[in-house]
Curated annotation (Swiss-Prot):
Keywords from the UniProt entry: Cell outer membrane, Ion transport, Membrane, Porin, Signal, Transmembrane, Transmembrane beta strand, Transport
Source organism phylogeny: Bacteria, Pseudomonadati, Pseudomonadota, Alphaproteobacteria, Hyphomicrobiales
Outcome of mutating residue 264 to Q: In strain: 019 and 76-250
Assembly and binders: Homotrimer.
Documented effect of changing residue 31 to S: In strain: 019
One GO CC term on file: pore complex
UniProt-recorded name of the protein: Porin Omp2b
Length: 367
């Protein structure tokens, strides 16, 4: 055997051995692609796709801390010290497209902590379960405040009454409902038609709401009924609603107009009438037959907005409130507010004082 034959034989043996080892090797599978969270911009800022779906989700909310002093302008009582309310408000929105329109949900969880002298928190929504601590002036509460489903213009679940939402509530004021314009949270089935020319209409069947002292929910199969019409344009809007209270078998109505004087200055006016001259009802909760509210907003600077609201009802209550909402940095707003209430006419028989002055400072971080 010569050297050439030896080298060729060794090379052939090495190739055969390498082929056998390659045939026996375990091939590792390709790693699965990582699915990162995708931004969903179809419904506005803050939405992202839930991984593995075509549903968009947004998580938002705020933390706010209110410090109140002086009188309770809702009841006329002296607070005799500082009242404090802390609220964590978490909101979850989902949206996706279907052949019947946008399918959405909205859920709000609210956590309250109240520490005060008067045991009055003086504003809508701060209902909490009392937990006596020392003198009983501390309370906490957790609340599934709102939860509803929407499909196109259809809505079903727990929300605020269309008697409020369709006309646009009241002013950008903390103590905005010293003269109440109706109850708030309710179970409802509603449909809103929105035209392409600024016209919209709503019809709603509602269960009725409740607050600390009263229950306005239906007592049978007949629901409360709300209907409304609205026209909106670049100049502002005009809206009207009519509601039937199936418990007391009475009705109430409101008409509101908003006008944009400039891009920084706007005014609004709202009038209401009820066929039952009592505030103890689901919709017409002002005193007497009628009530009127009005206000303005002036965006003084990019950071500061001035708000003013005044209201008066048939029984003689007058309420005036002013505030300045100042955005210290993006997402953090400080709002000092001063309110005055005059209890005249029939209201003198329900409160101890004729006048009430109160102040509040709100610190709110929105996210």
């Amino acid at each position: 055997m010569n050297i050439k034959s030896l080298l060729l034989g060794s090379a052939a043996a090495l190739v055969a051995a390498s082929g056998a080892q390659a045939a026996d090797a375990i091939v590792a599978p390709e790693p699965e692609a990582v699915e990162y969270v995708r931004v969903c911009d179809a419904y506005g800022a803050g939405y992202f796709y839930i991984p593995g779906t075509e549903t968009c989700l947004r998580i938002s909310g705020y933390v706010r801390y209110d410090v109140k002093g002086g009188d309770d302008v809702y009841t006329g009582s002296d607070r005799k010290g500082w009242d404090k309310v802390l609220v964590l408000h978490s909101m979850f929105n989902t949206n996706s497209e279907t052949e019947l329109g946008t399918l959405g949900t909205y859920t709000t969880l609210r956590f309250n902590y109240t520490s005060n002298n008067s045991r009055h928190d003086g504003q809508y929504g701060d209902f909490s379960d009392d937990r006596d601590v020392a003198d009983g002036s501390v309370s906490t509460g957790t609340d599934l405040q709102f939860a509803y489903i929407t499909l196109g213009g259809f809505k079903v679940g727990i929300d605020e009454s269309e008697f409020h939402t369709f006309t646009g509530y009241l002013g950008d004021i903390i103590n905005d409902d010293v003269i109440s314009a109706g109850s708030y949270r309710t179970g409802k089935i509603a449909y809103t038609f929105t035209g392409g020319n600024g016209f919209s209409a709503v019809i709603a069947l509602e269960q009725g709401g409740e607050d600390v002292d009263n229950d306005y929910t239906i007592d049978g199969y007949m629901p409360h009924v709300v209907g409304g019409l609205k026209y909106a344009g670049g100049w502002g809007s005009i809206a009207g609603v009519v509601a039937y209270d199936s418990v007391i078998e009475e009705w109430a109505t409101k008409v509101r107009g908003d006008v944009n004087i400039t891009d920084r200055f706007s005014v609004w006016l709202q009038g209401a009438y009820s066929s039952a001259a009592t505030p103890n009802q689901n919709y017409g909760q002002w005193g007497g037959d009628w009530a009127v509210w009005g206000g303005l907003k002036y965006q003084a600077t990019q950071k500061a907005a001035f708000n003013l609201q005044a209201a008066h009802d048939d029984w003689g209550k007058t309420a005036v409130t002013a505030n300045v909402a100042y955005e210290l940095v993006p997402g953090f707003t400080v709002t000092p507010e001063v309110s005055y209430t005059k209890f005249g006419g029939e209201w003198k028989n329900t409160v101890a004082e004729d006048n009430a002055w109160g102040g509040i400072v709100r610190f709110q971080r929105s996210f």
